[in-house]
């Protein structure tokens, strides 16, 4: 078995997950991945309250106090390739999540502009409102195209972490 001590901060859905993939250094100073069952003695979770953003999901601190993980729960990957692969996949997912939220905001803005009456006509008929809606839709479409392109690169195993970071940053 391996013994984990320490904590991991800002873990998305840490408070609801039944297990955690945890990356830690072993006695040889190599980074290893472990599958940690939530019921293991020495493993606890503290939810982080009063966040300024990302309120749609639970964010937690994972706490390990002499948590004994069976050797069979250690992943085969050694080094940073494993955690960075997980992080890149999460970043890619975040880019699509942001696009979904953006599209919902655009739909609300468009509907509002069609129903909000000012000077006896919908504000959607005003040129400045139309320009703002067009700019919103254009930015969303550009984000979708970027995320789609990165997804195709990922399918061919050609996506660089910079591509994925760009998709997250721009979306």
Tell where the protein language model's regions lie, with residue ranges.
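A short core secondary-structure module
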Residues: 5-45
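Long, acidic (Asp/Glu-rich), low-complexity accessory segments flanking structured domains
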Residues: 62-82
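Glycine-rich phosphate/pyrophosphate-binding beta-alpha loops
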Residues: 9-15, 54, 89-93
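Alpha-helical interface subdomain recognition
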Residues: 1-2, 61-63, 85-171
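Flexible, small-/acidic-enriched active-site or ligand-binding loops
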Residues: 39-68
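Residue-level preference for beta-strand/loop junctions
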Residues: 16-18, 56, 127, 163
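A general structural signal for short secondary-structure junctions and capping/turn motifs
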Residues: 25, 53-55, 169
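Short clusters of hydrophobic/aromatic residues that line enzyme substrate/ligand-binding pockets
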Residues: 43-45, 52-54, 74-75, 83, ...
């Amino acid at each position: 078995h391996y013994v984990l001590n320490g904590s991991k901060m800002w873990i998305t859905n840490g408070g609801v997950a039944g297990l955690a993939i945890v990356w830690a250094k072993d006695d040889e100073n190599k980074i290893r991945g472990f599958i940690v069952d939530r019921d293991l003695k020495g493993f606890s979770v503290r939810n982080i309250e009063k966040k300024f953003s990302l309120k749609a999901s639970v964010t937690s601190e994972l706490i390990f106090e002499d948590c004994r993980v069976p050797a069979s729960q250690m992943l085969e990957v050694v080094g940073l390739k494993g955690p960075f692969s997980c992080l890149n996949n999460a970043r890619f997912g975040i880019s699509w999540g942001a696009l979904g939220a953006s599209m919902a905001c655009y739909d609300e803005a468009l509907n509002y502009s069609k129903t909000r009456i000012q000077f006896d006509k919908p504000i959607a008929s005003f040129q400045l409102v139309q320009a703002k809606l067009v700019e919103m839709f254009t930015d969303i479409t550009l984000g979708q195209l970027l995320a789609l392109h990165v997804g195709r690169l990922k399918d061919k195993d050609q996506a660089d972490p910079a591509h994925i970071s760009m998709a997250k940053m721009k979306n």
